[in-house]
Amino acid sequence: MRNYPLKAVCAVLMLGLSACSSLPTSGPTDSAVLEINQGADASELAAKVNVIELNESLVQQIYAAQQSQRFSGFADVRGNGGYAGAVNVGDVLEISIWEAPPAVLFGTTFSSEGQGSGHVTQLPSQIVNKNGTVTVPFVGNISVAGKTPEAIQAQIVASLSRKANQPQAVVKIANNNSSDVTVIRQGSAVRMPLTANDERVLDAVAAIGGSTGNIEDVTVQLTRGNQVKTLAFETLIADPKQNIVLRAGDVVSLLNTPYKFTGLGAVGNNQQLRFSSSGITLAEAIGKMGGLIDTRSDPRGVFVFRYMPFAQLDSKAQQEWAAKGYGNGMEVPTVYHANLLQPETMFLLQRFPIQDKDIVYVSNAPLSEFQKFLRIIFSITSPVTSTTNTIRSY
């Protein structure tokens, strides 16, 4: 009879041990994450997770890719300077021709106004056609595409010199339709003609009336040919080198996209947190989450979960993941691992950038899980021990 309570305690302990796997926890352990794509029982998604250790080479590579988004890195295939003042297809030209008296060609043919001792004739406005030409009376079609107004003036005078009396010409671009920039903002879009003033990115932002959103949430996207770069509005304002001269055909877009990441695990705050479009580092993200909880966290198990666009992988990685069924337009599930027990990792945290929709997870320490188990065991065995003592007292 006296062994019965002891057997009951042992039975409760065995029951507690069998329930170890059911202990409440905030997420997987560090070993579970690191071995996610290993083992025969790995799910189809888990088998395709890319687990990457944080190291100096990787951080430098990611940092360089982030710097490549700066507008100052645009390749300028047109040489220095912006708008060159050249006429092109679609432009509207106004041509005025002077002829000294006595006027030979332009005396009565067109409506004109006297001006001093000369005679000026204003030709009807003309749109440069697809062939790049306009028509001038007594000259015919002349090629103007790619030429400046001054060059066209000289061309007209040379063509009329043997027909008119001391001709002079003035060519003006009335509407610059071929050299403009498209500026887009939510609910609004404008076309900004380029001039010899060399308009820059911030001029385009001003042309559309600036941003309507919080400056911390706004990014500026510049599309030039096949290149697309996105930069935080704050960075564009703070760094004059990014306020580059615009080119004909550029598209400037103001995007109001609040950036967020989610903090989970053994950290001070398990929640979704916003950050500026200028970005934050992993070190700053951990600080925003309230840091690691001393009594729970495993500093060896700091992870960043992210979907990485296939196109952003290097050529070697693309070949590896293409063999697993990935291709352009797809995203590779990626986990970055940092071990904070290694002092050099602290420097890497200050360069590793957090991206929109990232999950930053800190695993629980093994000792923390064991302490949970002990609390459960003691909460179960205490009433049994009390009962045993009561029975023995009889």
Swiss-Prot record:
Q: Provide any one GO MF term from the record.
A: porin activity
The main location is membrane
Signal peptide region: 1-19
What UniProt keywords apply to this chain's record, in alphabetical order?
Capsule biogenesis/degradation, Cell outer membrane, Ion transport, Lipoprotein, Membrane, Palmitate, Polysaccharide transport, Porin, Signal, Sugar transport, Transmembrane, Transmembrane beta strand, Transport
Q: Where is the lipid attached (N-palmitoyl cysteine)?
A: 20
GO cellular component terms, alphabetically, are: cell outer membrane; pore complex
Give the Pfam families listed for this entry.
Poly_export (PF02563), SLBB_2 (PF22461)
Does the keyword Transcription feature in the UniProt annotation?
no
* Bilayer topology term: Multi-pass membrane protein
Compartment annotation: Cell outer membrane
* Lipidation, S-diacylglycerol cysteine type: 20
Extract one GO BP annotation from the record: monoatomic ion transport
Similarity annotation: Belongs to the BexD/CtrA/VexA family.
User: What job does the chain carry out?
Assistant: May form an ATP-driven capsule polysaccharide export apparatus, in association with the BexA, BexB and BexC proteins. May function as a membrane anchor for capsular polysaccharides. Possible porin properties.
Q: Which PANTHER family match?
A: POLYSACCHARIDE EXPORT PROTEIN GFCE-RELATED
What protein does this entry describe?
Answer: Capsule polysaccharide export protein BexD
Source organism of the structure? Haemophilus influenzae
Q: Which gene encodes it?
A: bexD
